[in-house]
């Protein structure tokens, strides 16, 4: 793959086109995003997110940046942990997803001490040492230059700050992997067509999971960006993994 191309699912595309293509996917699925998440995971995604927040060890009064925050699930959980004395930034590169997240936070009565930002994870517009914790949930696989994004996150974290990456990963059990592939490439697009009238976007999401670095590769990328004490926690045999790293 040349330096001017990247992957969009299983397709090879010009680097400069990927962000707009990803944006179009989430423009398409935004209206049914929460419904599809519940349906695709039988609601288990909510448990995964709670585990990720538990591993972040955020405390009252801390500042958190939730990247690719979408409809606000992680932001809501973080806001409850840091309280009104803390501060959470709900961010997403997609305006429609961010709008839905903002509406949800307001409806849940959590708007105090929450801000909103439409930003690119590769170019965070915050000063050095701004946040106690940065999270990115089910979003890093959609980033074109993951190394740039990790470097940007490292810069924006305070010394002692934590990075939490919640993402689909590599399944360890061979039998489960075969069943998961069948579900991902047959059932998932069917559900996307049935519920969201968009099979192609969910086919891309399945492909993007397979193209994402596995647990060890992502851990190495975090270490290369400067993070220390990097580790990961497999959930459901590696269908999902939570990576954690510290800036010291």
Swiss-Prot record:
Which GO-annotated molecular functions does the record name? Answer: 2-methoxy-6-polyprenyl-1,4-benzoquinol methyltransferase activity; demethylmenaquinone methyltransferase activity
The catalytic activity, as recorded, is:
a 2-demethylmenaquinol + S-adenosyl-L-methionine = a menaquinol + S-adenosyl-L-homocysteine + H(+); a 2-methoxy-6-(all-trans-polyprenyl)benzene-1,4-diol + S-adenosyl-L-methionine = a 5-methoxy-2-methyl-3-(all-trans-polyprenyl)benzene-1,4-diol + S-adenosyl-L-homocysteine + H(+)
As recorded in UniProt, its EC number(s) are 2.1.1.163, 2.1.1.201
The record's top EC class is transferase
Q: Name one GO biological process term.
A: aerobic respiration
CDD domains, per database record: AdoMet_MTases (cd02440)
Please give the pathway this protein is involved in.
Quinol/quinone metabolism; menaquinone biosynthesis; menaquinol from 1,4-dihydroxy-2-naphthoate: step 2/2; Cofactor biosynthesis; ubiquinone biosynthesis
What Gene3D superfamilies has UniProt attached to this entry? Vaccinia Virus protein VP39
Q: Which UniProt keywords apply?
A: Menaquinone biosynthesis, Methyltransferase, S-adenosyl-L-methionine, Transferase, Ubiquinone biosynthesis
> Which Pfam families does the annotation name?
Ubie_methyltran
> Where is S-adenosyl-L-methionine annotated to bind?
71, 92, 120-121
Q: Which PANTHER family match?
A: 2-METHOXY-6-POLYPRENYL-1,4-BENZOQUINOL METHYLASE, MITOCHONDRIAL, METHYLTRANSFERASE
Q: In UniProt terms, what function does this protein have?
A: Methyltransferase required for the conversion of demethylmenaquinol (DMKH2) to menaquinol (MKH2) and the conversion of 2-polyprenyl-6-methoxy-1,4-benzoquinol (DDMQH2) to 2-polyprenyl-3-methyl-6-methoxy-1,4-benzoquinol (DMQH2).
Q: Which family does it belong to?
A: Belongs to the class I-like SAM-binding methyltransferase superfamily. MenG/UbiE family.
Protein name, per record: Ubiquinone/menaquinone biosynthesis C-methyltransferase UbiE
